[in-house]
UniProtKB/Swiss-Prot annotation:
Consequence recorded when altering residue 158 to F: In sy433; Reduces induction of expression of heat shock protein hsp-16.2 in response to heat-shock
InterPro entries per record: Cyclin-like_dom (IPR013763), Cyclin-like_sf (IPR036915), Cyclin/Ssn8 (IPR043198), Cyclin_N (IPR006671)
Name the record gives this protein: Cyclin L homolog cyl-1
Gene Ontology cellular component list: nucleus
Family, similarity comment: Belongs to the cyclin family.
Composition bias type Polar residues, residue spans: 45-58
Biased composition, class Basic and acidic residues, residue ranges: 33-44, 384-409, 418-442, 454-472
Domain of life: Eukaryota
Gene name of this polypeptide: cyl-1
Function: Involved in pre-mRNA splicing. Functions in association with cyclin-dependent kinases (CDKs). Involved in induction of expression of heat shock protein hsp-16.2 in response to heat shock. Plays a role in male tail development, perhaps acting together with cell cycle regulators cdc-25.2, cdk-1, cyb-3, and cyd-1.
Organism of origin: Caenorhabditis elegans
Gene3D superfamilies: Cyclin-like (1.10.472.10)
Segments of this protein annotated with the region Disordered: 25-58, 368-480
Amino acid sequence: MASFVEMRKLAEAKVQNMIRTIVKPKEQNGNVEPKKEEDEKFESTYKQNENTQITPSSFGKRPLYSKVDINCDKWLMTLDEESRLKIDNPPSLVDGLSKETESELRYLGCELIQQGAILLKLPQTAAATGQILFQRYYYQKSFVRYHFEHAVQACLLLASKIEEEPRRPREVYNVFHRLERLHRLQQSGHDINKETTRGMKPPAVDMNYINTKQHMINSERRILATLGFVVHVKHPHRLIVAYGHTLGITQSRPDILQRSWNYMNDGLRTDIFMRYKPETIACACIFLAARTVENPIALPSTPFHWFEAFDTSDRDVEAIALQLVGLYARRTFPNWPRIKAELDALRSVKDAEMKAVKAKEIAENLAKMAPDGEKSTSTVTIGKDSRKVSPDRKNGTKDRGEADRGKKEKDRHRRRSNDRDGRGDRRDRDKDRGDRRKDEKKDRRKRTRSRSRDRKDKNRNRDVGKRYRKESSTPPRSRR
C-alpha cells in the first residue's frame, strides 16, 4: 500500500494541468534572482484575475475554476442581504399581488401537495420535499406569471422521483383533478362523504389531459432550472427523535414526540424552512410541544436553555413557535376560485401592459426606419392596441407586390395570344392527356410492386409452413 507521501505526490502530479502555481523568485547564495519580463507580466495578470472568494486547495494552490455550491443550505433566505430582501418582498408583490393573497397561495399550494401525497400513497418525506420545493420556487418566480396549479403537480411529480417513489403523470393528474372537485364541493357547502364522492370518476384522456400533462412537464423542467438542480432537502424529523432521546422523553413522554412531529408537518405550510435551519426548527417544535400537551413538562433551563446545546438561540425558537401558533389561528381554508379570479385579472393587466410596451417599441423602430419628412398615415392594430405606421415602410413588400402584378399581366397576355391563334385549348388538352398518362404509369408500377410483394410473402409463408411440418414431432392430423 502506498504511503501518504506517495499519494500526495501522485495527487500533485494529477492536478498540474488544472491549477497554476504562483511564480516566486529563486534564491541562490542568498541573492534573489531578478524577475524576468514574462514572470512579471504573468504575476500582474494573475493578481488582477485572482478570485479572493475561492479558498486554497489542500496543497496550498489556488484553482482556476470557481466554486459550485450544491449544498441545500444555500436556500436559507436569511444568510445575506439580497435573500432577506427577497423573502420580505417576493416577486409576486412586484406584479401587484397582495401580501395576504401571496401567503394564502403558499398555504393552498402546500396543502394540495400534502393531500395529493396522501392520495398517491407517498411517504411523508416526499410530501415534505414537494412543499419545500414549492416554497423555494415561488421565492424566485411570481404567482402571476406562472400558474401555481402546474407547479403543484410538478412538485408532486418531482418529489416522488427524488424520494425514489416515482409516480406517473397520469396518476398525478387524476389526483389533482379529484382534489379540485372536492374543493368545489367544500366551497359550495356540501359535506365530504361517500355519497357525495361516489360519482367522481377519473377524467377522460382528452386534449385537456394532454395539455395539462405538457404544462406539468414544462413546469418540472422550469423548477429544476430555477433551483439549479439543487433539490435535496434536509428534513428535521430524525432530529426530533434524536433530541428527544437526548432529553430522555422518548420512552417516558411519547406524546411530546408525536406532537412535535405534527408541528413539524404543519410547519411545512409556512416559510420557516426558508428562514431557519432544521436543527432550529426541531428544537422549536419540541419546545412548543412540551408546553401544549395535556400534561406539560419543564425542560432543562439551567445553567442555560437546553436548545442552546444544539446551537440554537432563544430568539429563533420563540419566533418559530409564534409562527406555528399563528398557523393554527387560521379559521377558513383559502377560497380557490376567488384567488384564481384575482390572478387572472392581474395576468390580463400584465399582458395588456406588455403589449403596449411592445407596440411602443415597434412604433419607435418604424419611426427611425421611415425617411425624413414623411409622416405615417395608416394604423396597424396589435391586439387591442394600435399604432401609426408608414405605408411604404418596407421596400421588400412593395417590390414583391410589383413583381406579382407583372406576373399577372404576362399570364393575361399569354392567354389572349393563345385564344387569338386557337392554340390555347389544344395545348391544355395535350397537357391533360400527358398528365393522365403519367398517373397511369405510376399506378401500374404500384400495382406491379404490390403483386410481387404479395407473391413473395405467400411463398415465404408456404416455405415456413413446410419446414415447420417437417421438423415438428407431432403426428399429422387425420383427415375426415
